[in-house]
């Protein structure tokens, strides 16, 4: 937005305005995800960039994302604002994929393809009322999310933040302390978070990425209690599958899941790819979207709840 306003004030040609707007978006998404490359892939997939336009937008976008990262990392005597990375420290190691884990990749992909469209259906159903009676439905939506958080907290003894917020800050504690969550608590968290996600999509603004990742991680942890599925593999496949169902961005979803696991990312990547592809294809068959709807456009207006939106 700032890049676009500056360009229009300087009377930059319309094509230049688009390039500057894209560069600003690259930098913003790269900061949010803690990785310039992930931000670049996300925007390229979401915008459907290709051909000559790809080079025109990609180079200034990568430059803006790189400079933005330097501001946070620091340079020489400049300490920077502090780094953020999707990678989670202290996770248990992952060896080599097994046949059973590839079977679980298919199961997780199909499960995500069933859960994701349900969340979107709830969001679209409620949005028809939110558009007509905004001043009534939006406060009621906030109350509904709060009630879901209270039900979860009272039943499990866990923090309400697991349900209330986007999941960006809660993802690390969830995976690190996964052993402290019973299967019942995980199933209840999955239900409450999914309902809160759908309600928030219908009425509030925000980004859809971290709620999808959090729900996928919860599902993967719950399934890891069953034989043949290690925790790390379940989390990675759940995150990738749920992300692609909600974002419809396969490459970005694979990167999000593998970057999260740092050194284990390469080892678990084949499983994530299978889960993402199965989820993407199954979701397209179960709940096909209109051809005119571009990837990610569903989230351009109203969106999932973020930490800042929830606190506001």
Predicted regions and their residues:
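Alpha-helical transmembrane segments and immediately membrane-proximal extracytoplasmic
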Residues: 1-312
């Amino acid at each position: 937005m700032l890049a676009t306003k500056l360009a229009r004030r300087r009377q930059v040609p319309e094509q230049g305005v688009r390039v500057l707007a894209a560069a600003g978006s690259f930098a913003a998404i790269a900061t949010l995800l803690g990785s310039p490359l992930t931000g670049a892939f996300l925007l390229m997939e979401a915008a459907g960039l290709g051909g000559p336009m790809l080079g025109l937008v990609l180079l200034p976008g990568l430059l803006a994302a790189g400079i933005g990262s330097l501001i946070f990392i620091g340079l020489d005597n400049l300490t920077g604002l502090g780094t953020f990375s999707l990678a989670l420290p202290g996770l248990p190691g992952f060896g080599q994929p097994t046949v059973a884990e590839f079977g679980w990749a298919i199961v997780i992909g199909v499960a995500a393809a069933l859960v994701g469209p349900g969340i979107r259906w709830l969001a679209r159903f409620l949005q028809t009322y939110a558009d007509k009676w905004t001043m009534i439905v939006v406060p009621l939506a906030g109350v509904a999310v709060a009630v879901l958080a209270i039900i979860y907290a009272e039943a499990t003894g866990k923090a309400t933040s697991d349900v209330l917020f986007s999941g960006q800050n809660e993802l690390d504690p969830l995976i690190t302390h996964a052993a402290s969550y019973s299967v019942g608590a995980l199933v209840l968290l999955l239900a409450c978070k999914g309902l809160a996600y759908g309600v928030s999509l219908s009425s509030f603004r925000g980004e859809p990425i971290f709620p999808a990742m959090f729900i996928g991680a919860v599902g993967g942890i719950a399934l890891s209690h069953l034989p043949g599925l290690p925790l790390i593999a379940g989390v990675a496949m759940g995150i990738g599958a749920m992300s692609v169902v909600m974002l419809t961005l396969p490459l970005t979803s694979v990167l999000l899941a593998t970057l999260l696991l740092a050194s284990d990312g390469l080892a678990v990547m084949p499983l994530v790819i299978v889960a993402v592809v199965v989820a993407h294809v199954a979701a397209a068959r179960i709940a096909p979207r209109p051809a005119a709807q571009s990837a990610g456009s569903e989230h351009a207006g109203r969106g999932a709840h973020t930490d800042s939106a929830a606190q506001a």
